[in-house]
């Protein structure tokens, strides 16, 4: 079994009101990713993603593109920690 990696993502640009969180939830289910995603008051979307290195890399690639209606101007990716068993959409913070 491969070791889990965890990354914190912050997407900026046109990322709210374009189904970014729901798209990420669906992509997480497809990739076997756990963690969470939420809108932030500053207009960005923040996520914490955990899974195999390949799955997390694929999720980061998806987040750089986002759903069709999104325009991701920048994506900040940093190491994170925690242990997650599902993927959830959280409330705006």
Regions found by a protein language model. Name each.
Residues 1-93:
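Intrinsically disordered, low-complexity, mixed-charge
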């Amino acid at each position: 079994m491969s070791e889990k990696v965890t990354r914190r993502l912050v997407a900026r640009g046109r990322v709210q009101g374009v189904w970014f969180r729901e798209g990420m939830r669906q992509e997480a289910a497809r990739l076997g990713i756990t963690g969470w995603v939420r809108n932030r008051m500053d207009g960005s979307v923040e996520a914490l993603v955990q899974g195999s290195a390949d799955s997390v890399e694929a999720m980061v690639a998806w987040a750089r593109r986002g759903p069709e209606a999104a325009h991701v101007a920048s994506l900040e990716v940093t190491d994170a920690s925690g242990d997650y068993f599902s993927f959830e959409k959280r409330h705006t913070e």
